[in-house]
Amino acid sequence: MQQQSPPEQLDLAGMVADLNSLLRLKTTVIGMKMFATVEEMTAIPKIRRPTAVHTTDQIVSMASRLGWTVGITADDLVGAQCRAVIGLAPQDEKFLEGTNYVGVWHGTPEDARKRQEALDVVAYGKYLALAVSPLSSGRLDPPDICLVYATPGQMIILINGLQYTGYKKFEWGVVGETACADSWGRALKTGEPSLSLPCFAERRYGGVPDEEMLIALSPAHLAKAITGMKQLAKNGLRYPIAPYGIQADVRAGMGASYAKK
């Protein structure tokens, strides 16, 4: 029987350099990795451990805004919501009730429960720890997922890159509050690229700017997007997208791409 070749080793630092060249990103691209034991997490080089209680949003932003490598367990997080999304607490009946959100984010217990049931979460019982780190550091090699914060204009070019070959229509949802379930929760659960509009908590506690969206995707999907974006750039479809002029004759601009078609 023919032996299968090992998966291709990705140049994570090179991928980040390509991303920054293609999209001019403001925010550090990071990796996220789950661990079955705390010891595996603490063995990561130069890992920091929190000395206070945080939201997962804050931990993620310590990597994406400050460039830190940070590891956590359930005890480092503020409550069941943060823990449950990443599989560090059970998604039990108490979690599904969402009592804390009634009269805050939702008008009735029924609404709160529907939201809780709609969340994409990592199954409980497999992992005990999580770490985040700048992707270019290579400390999480490989990470389970990569997190890319980008403006809408940058994000659509990245998505176009993913769709350049092997086209797939992406259908994403918006749970509202706890939007981290739309990004890293869904990507960790399904392995699929997952786009989100960062929620109130991510912006208040994680410091995500108004103009940024978030996509979580595997290193392989990110590499595919980069390959696609490079080809798009050769075709004249690149970031920044230069405004053509709302009153200009569009034929010259369209002709650059489609005249020979």
PLM ranges: what are they?
Residues S5-K261:
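Acidic, serine/proline-rich low-complexity intrinsically disordered regions
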